[in-house]
C-alpha cells in the first residue's frame, strides 16, 4: 500500500490545493508514482475524465502536476451547489441527485464505503497518495460526521501537515488555535505546520516560528512565499474576478454570472501579453469589448434572470447587433437561444420555462440525465468572423443537463454570435490563436503584437516553478521522514 501525507488548512483558501499540487510535482520529480486524493470537494469548477466521470478541477490540476491521467477515484464525492442550501451530489463521477445540505450532512457517513474503496484502489497502484483536506478541520459543528479532514485522516491513518495563510494576517493564532481545538488523538496526527503566502524576509519570522513550535509541540515544516505561478486553482477565484487589467490591444469581457462554473475555460486568453480578460457583473462596466463571453453556470435559468435584471442582457444584445463577437459556453450557450424549458424542475429554480436572449435559433429542454463526456474533432461549418476555425482540431468535454434543438457540431454560429457545449474549447492553442487573429484583423492590429507562447510547455514550466517553490519552502527531509512514519 502507498505511503500517504495529508495537507489540511486552517481555513478555506489557505492554499491547500496549490501546495498539494506542488508536493505531487516534487515527488514525481524525485521518482515516485504519486496520486492526489480529496474525499469530498465542493466546487462548480469540474472536469470530465476519459471514461465520462465528473470530478473537481483541483484534483485534475494535481494529477497533471503528478504527470498522470485524472481519475474520479481522486475525488470520489463532488458537491456542486445549486442553491444556498443544496447541492448536486456526484459520487464516483456520476450524479446521484440534488440534496439539501442538512440531508447530505445526515447521510454523509453513508458515503464512507465509496471514499474508502476509491482511496484503497489508488493506494494499491501508486507509491504515495497526497491527500487534500477541505476548509478547516475544527469546524466544531461538522466534526461528528467528518469524512474529509481528521475523520478521513483517521480512516486512512494519514499524518497531517497544517497550513496557515499569513497573507491575511493572524497566522500564529490560526495555526495554534486549530491545533488546540483538536482532540488529543487528532493532535498527535499533526506532524508539522506550514506558513503559506509569506512576503518578506524569513528571518523576521524566526522568533514567532520558534514560539509557534513550542506552543503547538510540532515543528514548522515550511515557510512558502506568496507564489506567482499561473496555475488553475479553485482558491484563486476571488483574485481572478478582482482583476481589471489595464487596456490592451484586444479586450475580452467575461460575464461574471452569480453561479459561474468552469471559469478556467478562459484562462488561455489571459496568457497573451496584450489581451485584457475582464470579469464583468454590471452593465456599465461592459463598455465596448472586442469579444463578450457568457460562461457556463450551474443554474442557467436563475443566472439568465439575473442577467436580465442587471441590464447586462440588453447591453449584450445591443453589442451583438453592433457586430461585437459574442460567444456562449454551455449554460451561456443555452442563454443565447430563443427558449429554455425545465418541465421536470431539473434546476429547481421554480421556473418551468423562460425566453432566452434570442441571439441564436436554439430551443433547450432540461432533462434528468446528465451529459458528461470528453469530446474532440475538427471544426466544420463555422461561418462568419471565426470561419478560419474550419479544419482545425478542438478537444474538451461536455457537462450539462439540457438538450438543445438545432445545435450542430462543436460550434454553432449565426452572424457574429457563437455557442458551444464544449468546455475547454479554447485550450488548444490553435483555436485561441485563430479567434484572436480574427479579432486583430477586424481591429486592424497585428496578431504578433499580442505576444505568443507554447501553451503546453508553458503549463509544464508553471508546475516546475511551483515544485521549485515547494521544495525550497518545505523542510523536505522532514517531509520524507513523515512519509516514512519516522516522526
Set out the residue ranges of the language-model regions.
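A conserved active-site-flanking secondary-structure segment within enzyme catalytic domains
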Residues: 337-391
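Catalytic nucleophile serine of serine hydrolases
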Residues: 330
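Short active-site segment of divalent metal-dependent hydrolases/proteases
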Residues: 333-334, 426
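Flexible phosphate-sensing "switch/lid" loops adjacent to ATP/NTP-binding sites
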Residues: 1-320, 325, 342-345, 368-369, ...
Amino acid at each position: 500500500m502507498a505511503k500517504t501525507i495529508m495537507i489540511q488548512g486552517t481555513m478555506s483558501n489557505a492554499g491547500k490545493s496549490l501546495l498539494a499540487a506542488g508536493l505531487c510535482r516534487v515527488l514525481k520529480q524525485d521518482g515516485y508514482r504519486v496520486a492526489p486524493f480529496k474525499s469530498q470537494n465542493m466546487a462548480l469548477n469540474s472536469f470530465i475524465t476519459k471514461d465520462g466521470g465528473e470530478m473537481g478541477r483541483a484534483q485534475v490540476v494535481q494529477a497533471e502536476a503528478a504527470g498522470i491521467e485524472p481519475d474520479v477515484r481522486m475525488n470520489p464525492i463532488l458537491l456542486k451547489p445549486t442553491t444556498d442550501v443544496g447541492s448536486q451530489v456526484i459520487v464516483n463521477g456520476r450524479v446521484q441527485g440534488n440534496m439539501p445540505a442538512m440531508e447530505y450532512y445526515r447521510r454523509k457517513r453513508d458515503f464512507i464505503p465509496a471514499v474508502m474503496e476509491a482511496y484503497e484502489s489508488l493506494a494499491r497502484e501508486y507509491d504515495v497518495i497526497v491527500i487534500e483536506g477541505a476548509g478547516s478541520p475544527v469546524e466544531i459543528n461538522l466534526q461528528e460526521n467528518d469524512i474529509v479532514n481528521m475523520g478521513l485522516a483517521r480512516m486512512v491513518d494519514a499524518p497531517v501537515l497544517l497550513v496557515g495563510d499569513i497573507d491575511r494576517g493572524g497566522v500564529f493564532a490560526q495555526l495554534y488555535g486549530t491545533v488546540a481545538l483538536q482532540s488529543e488523538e487528532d493532535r498527535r496526527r499533526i506532524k508539522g505546520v506550514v506558513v503559506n503566502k509569506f512576503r518578506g524576509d524569513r528571518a523576521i519570522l524566526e522568533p514567532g516560528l520558534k514560539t509557534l513550535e513550542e506552543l503547538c509541540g510540532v515543528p514548522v515544516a515550511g515557510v512558502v512565499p506568496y507564489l506567482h505561478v499561473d496555475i488553475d486553482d479553485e482558491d484563486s477565484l476571488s483574485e481572478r474576478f478582482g482583476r481589471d487589467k489595464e487596456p490592451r490591444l484586444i479586450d475580452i469581457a467575461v460575464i461574471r454570472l452569480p453561479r459561474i462554473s468552469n471559469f478556467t475555460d478562459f484562462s488561455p486568453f489571459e496568457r497573451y501579453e496584450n489581451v485584457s480578460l475582464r470579469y464583468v457583473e454590471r452593465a456599465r462596466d461592459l463598455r465596448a469589448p472586442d469579444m463578450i463571453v457568457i460562461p457556463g453556470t450551474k443554474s442557467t435559468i436563475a443566472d439568465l434572470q439575473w442577467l436580465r435584471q442587471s441590464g447586462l442582457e440588453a447591453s449584450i444584445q445591443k453589442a451583438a447587433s453592433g457586430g461585437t463577437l459574442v460567444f456562449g459556453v454551455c449554460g451561456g450557450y443555452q442563454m443565447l437561444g430563443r427558449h429554455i424549458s425545465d418541465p421536470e424542475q431539473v434546476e429547481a429554480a421554480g421556473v418551468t420555462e423562460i425566453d432566452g436572449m434570442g441571439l441564436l435559433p436554439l430551443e433547450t429542454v432540461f432533462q434528468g440525465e446528465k451529459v458528461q463526456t470528453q469530446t474532440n474533432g475538427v471544426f466544420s461549418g463555422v461561418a462568419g468572423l471565426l470561419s478560419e476555425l474550419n479544419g482545425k482540431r478542438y478537444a474538451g468535454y461536455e457537462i450539462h443537463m439540457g438538450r438543445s434543438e438545432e445545435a450542430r457540431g462543436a460550434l454553432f454560429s449565426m452572424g457574429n454570435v457563437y455557442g458551444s457545449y464544449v468546455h475547454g474549447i479554447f485550450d488548444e492553442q490553435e483555436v485561441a490563436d485563430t479567434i484572436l487573429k480574427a479579432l486583430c484583423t477586424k481591429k486592424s492590429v497585428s496578431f504578433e503584437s499580442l505576444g505568443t507562447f507554447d501553451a503546453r510547455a508553458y503549463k509544464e514550466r508553471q508546475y516546475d516553478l511551483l515544485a521549485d517553490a515547494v521544495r525550497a519552502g518545505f523542510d523536505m527531509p522532514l517531509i520524507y521522514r513523515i512519509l516514512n512514519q519516522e516522526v
